[in-house]
Amino acid sequence: MLPALLCDSELYATQLPTLTDLADPLVVTWAERDMARAAALVLERGPARFVLAGTSAGGNLALEVLAAAPARVAGLWLTGVNPGRHADPDGARLMQQRVRAGEFEAVLDVLAARCVHAAGARADEALGVLRAMARRAGPDVFLRQSEAVITRRDRWDVLTGLDVPTLLLWGREDAFASVETARAIADRVRDARLVVVDDCGHLPTLERPEACVPAVRTWLIAVAERALGAPLR
């Protein structure tokens, strides 16, 4: 599991305990300045074959892993991912400049407000958790991760014809990657299931944590059944 920018395992805190009967979840935090290098480190840590989950920038990293070693990926879960190149690199560079100038907290406020759907039932709690994760990561991690995000390659190609069970778990009010983007991904993947979570922005596992559990479990069961060639009993 590859968390979003400035996030760690707390992004999946509600889901992790509910999945241990189906998988052995491992959350890999990353802080490389280059997606290809980050992907190489993920592959070094992973088993011969694994299922892959990525949220936002972690989803871009997941696609880089998939590009590097497609035969090792048995299933894919993406949330809030734009598979193309960065939509606003100049704006992202300005954010980096502000952080270098000591304005990390101000930049965090901007990012957090855009990540979390303000009208959501758990918006305040989600914002608190997001800020806590970001402060644990700190400005240096932000600068390294954001460099990887800004310079990432277009990875739409790795999705075309992808034939592993794929979950697209999306917040309906996602301000970074629209539901239309998720539908475009689903159109390219042979075995995709799109689940749109209402009352939710960019981080469904944080904003609507309980609502995500059934979708993730259903996806993991599909992965297991594909591997076994038979339904789970």
Name what the model sees in each region:
Residues G54-G58, A62:
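Gly/Ala-rich beta-loop-alpha elbow adjacent to hydrolase catalytic centers
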Residues H86-D88, E105-G161:
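Conserved alpha/beta-hydrolase catalytic His-Asp/Glu region
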Residues V179, R183-H202:
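Catalytic histidine neighborhood in serine/cysteine hydrolases
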Residues L5, R172-D174, D199-G201:
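Acidic beta-to-alpha connecting loop that harbors the catalytic carboxylate
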Residues L162, L168-W170, D174:
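Short beta-strand/loop motif that positions the catalytic acidic residue
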Residues C200-V213:
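Catalytic histidine-centered segment of alpha/beta-hydrolase-like enzymes
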Residues M1-A36, A40-L41:
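Conserved HGGG/HGGXW glycine-rich cap/lid loop of the alpha/beta-hydrolase fold
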Residues A67-L108:
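Flexible "cap/lid" loop of the alpha/beta hydrolase fold
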